[in-house]
Structures are given as structure tokens and as C-alpha cells.
Amino acid sequence: KTYVAELMERARAAQKVAEKLAQVSRVKQVLCVTHLPQLAAMADIHFSVEKGEREGRTYTSVEELNREQRCRELARLTGGAHITAAMLAGAEELIASAEQYKAALNSKNK
């Protein structure tokens, strides 16, 4: 099966899709490319993908993020280049909420 989610504008819709992807990920592999913090926060593993140019050649770099890097990335997705302490706290809260949701899913499936 293939699931396709169109770009969502509303936070509530994004949260519902994130929860559905978390459910599906318990039995299938899910790869999600997103700019929505609600979806990104639900990831078990979070990668940052960047494209650049060097000496006339385009390159792509992929880096697995640790928790601190995830928080910074979610804060960046939320508010742009200028990251504040409040944005970092909000990102941490998103991750904690996602972890709580996934823990409840895991305990339900046992």
C-alpha cells in the first residue's frame, strides 16, 4: 500500500496525519518528507537533507539528527532562521508529546 498526504495547512490536520503515520509505522516502514513540525516530531529517526552547490556541482547531504539537533530543526521549521528559547521549548514539547503518543501505541499493541 502507498499512502500519499497532500500538503496540509492546518496544525490539527497535520497532527492527525502524524498520528496515522505513527500507527502505520508500527507495521510498515514509513518515509516522510515534510516541512511540518507536527509530522517531523513524530519520527522515530530524523534526518536533515540539504542541497548545495560546490565548484559548479550540485550535491545533497543527509545527516541523522540527535535529540538536540531535532529540537533545533523543529524550532527552525516552526519559526525560521531566528531560533528563540521559546521555540526550542515548543519543539521539545512536540517531541515529548509524540513520544508519549507512540509509547501509548506500543503499549496498546502488546
Q: Where on the chain are the PLM-derived regions?
A:
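Substrate-binding beta-hairpin/strand module that engages nucleic acids
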Residues: 1
